[in-house]
């Protein structure tokens, strides 16, 4: 995380004059043929522009259906699998890494999916500018950068202010689902979300939930399991 930008998180729809620290680093990456195909052929069909006002996603998808938004889908394997397994639902992915966007869109083209759209820009801007309040059934944040060093903790995306932004965008009863493979970050997210108003932890013990069946296991996660590494899932429901 070496960059900042002019548009901070807002919970009242108003821009703030200070500059916001980004929670991600823009990485250069070489495109494969398939990824480039995804961008060239799928981009015009499935990449949504950053809007100035809330988007009517019923119009975008041509129907009203349960709607999930994932922040930072990486190479898109899990999101693609989830969208293919639930054609009755609509999915929106947000990712700034162009090879990842291309990989996901290549999969969308290959599988002929109609229930997935993509933003290739900052997720905070997408939430603030494009997503209406009380409109999402679920928001997913899987394996975000934990920013291990203490001096970098301010760069973590999960903060009280972010939790409030997510809460506003979720419908009543909507779910904020997080997952991480680094236990200190899991503990940190649990602490933040437990302090965030307007949420209920869905874990029976008030901590973590078992891996939900709807979250696919990635190759990285399987390798970690073989090495004895854990993964922690957190699910918080919007209440009130």
Swiss-Prot record:
Substrate binds at residues 149, 181, 218-221. The active site is at 145. One of its GO terms (cellular component) is tRNA methyltransferase complex. Pathway: tRNA modification; N(7)-methylguanine-tRNA biosynthesis. Its EC number is 2.1.1.33. NCBIfam families: tRNA (guanosine(46)-N7)-methyltransferase TrmB. Belongs to the class I-like SAM-binding methyltransferase superfamily. TrmB family. This is tRNA (guanine-N(7)-)-methyltransferase.
